Amino acid sequence: MPKASDIKKNQAIEHNGKVYLIKDVYKSTSQGRAGGSIYRVRMYEVATGLKVDESFKADEMITLADFSRHQATFSYVDGDEYVFMDNEDYTPYNLHKDAIAEELPFVTETTEGIQVFTVNGQPVAIDLPASVDLVIVETDPSIKGASATARTKPATLSTGLVIQVPEYIASGEKIKVSTVDHKFMSRA
């Protein structure tokens, strides 16, 4: 059993008889003699999708749930469900759009490196690669000679995500975007 200090985003744990998927982990260090660090965890109950915020002491023992990852590719949308196909055995994994709302601006049919997380055989979340390639559908015209400046302009991507890009980037270009901080990285 791992300690609370070992838990990470997108792990599944059992807590108070229920299975939760961890979305965020924040470490706060106590002042003075109060003791060790406290980990504030935002997690979602797998069965109902309810958000729960919990605090754990660094040395508190945590029980991990039966959890596995599967390489998958986005296939299609079925109403409010997004269907991902397992790359090995073509098993379809249906995920409600609310469960993957944070990841959706980076998901296209050409996105590679997507992993579907399953808990007890049930799909609960996806994990994206560190960066994805997306096409700019709308931005201000590019400015010649603007590569020497660090000024940026807004650009709307093929998924609807709006990010800041350098002035020399034009509509129709494919760019690499960080899925961690939602920022322009380079041309693809």
UniProtKB/Swiss-Prot annotation:
Coiled coil: none annotated. PROSITE patterns: EFP (PS01275). Pfam families: EFP (PF01132), EFP_N (PF08207), Elong-fact-P_C (PF09285). One of its GO terms (molecular function) is translation elongation factor activity. CDD domains: S1_EF-P_repeat_1, S1_EF-P_repeat_2. Signal peptide: none annotated. GO terms for cellular component: cytoplasm. It comes from Saccharophagus degradans (strain 2-40 / ATCC 43961 / DSM 17024). PANTHER family: ELONGATION FACTOR P, TRANSLATION ELONGATION FACTOR KOW-LIKE DOMAIN-CONTAINING PROTEIN. GO terms for biological process: peptide biosynthetic process. This is Elongation factor P-like protein. The lineage of its organism: Bacteria, Pseudomonadati, Pseudomonadota, Gammaproteobacteria, Cellvibrionales. Belongs to the elongation factor P family.
